[in-house]
Amino acid sequence: MRFSRRDGGEGAMTSFVFYDTETTGTDTAFDQILQFAAIRTDDNMRELDRFEIRCRLLPHIVPAVGALIATGVSPRLLTDSTLPTHYEAARQIARKLADWSPSIFLGYNSMSFDEELLRQTFYQTLQPIYVTNTNGNTRGDILSLVNASTVVAPTALTIPIGTSGKPTRKLDTLAPANGYAHSNAHDALADVEATIFIAKVIGRMS
């Protein structure tokens, strides 16, 4: 997968930033980020840098039990005083993403969830909100590439069958079905690594 960057002309090196969040729930207007992870790569998806941070629970947030079970986050970890506050974590995330700009920001199902939650986090903590699509940055969603590949390159990926008997494109089942040992699903950094793996599989078929 190669792109020309808008500020550098044809042939300029593009960097991708693959990122993921683990949260207290699925409501992007209410829930908060508990873990953020990102890996920056070159245009051949070779790793250049990585970043990961966890933070403490905000006092007004009631986490969903299902989210804690899925992520394996214990009540003790939620209030661990050695972790940064939500505000401190947001500042570090914003600073790192700014340092990595301009880039193409990518996630898995990120456009409908992680992207919205990240913007809400930056809004709440007085950080620049539209980091991923301003100042030369662009964004995308690897799930959209997965959906497109099933039409234009149906043999590129093995699409597993879920418990309902229907095809599923959830990352924690898609990655193993295509040969990736995704043993730590719903850890933000592990999910980023799995997302890069899927992107590479699609890239080899492009």
Predicted regions located by residue number:
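Conserved non-catalytic scaffold segment of RNase H-like nuclease domains
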Residues: 2-124, 168, 172-178
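Short, glycine/acidic-enriched loop or turn micro-motifs at the edges of active sites
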Residues: 23-25, 144, 194
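A broadly used, surface-exposed interaction patch
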Residues: 73-76, 80-85, 128, 150-151, ...
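A short alpha->loop->secondary-structure connector
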Residues: 120-134
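Alpha-helix capping at helix-to-loop junctions
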Residues: 95, 99-102, 123-127, 145-155, ...
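Acidic, Mg2+-coordinating catalytic module of metal-dependent nucleases/exonucleases
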Residues: 104-117, 153-206
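Short alpha-helix plus adjacent loop in nuclease-associated cores
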Residues: 134-161
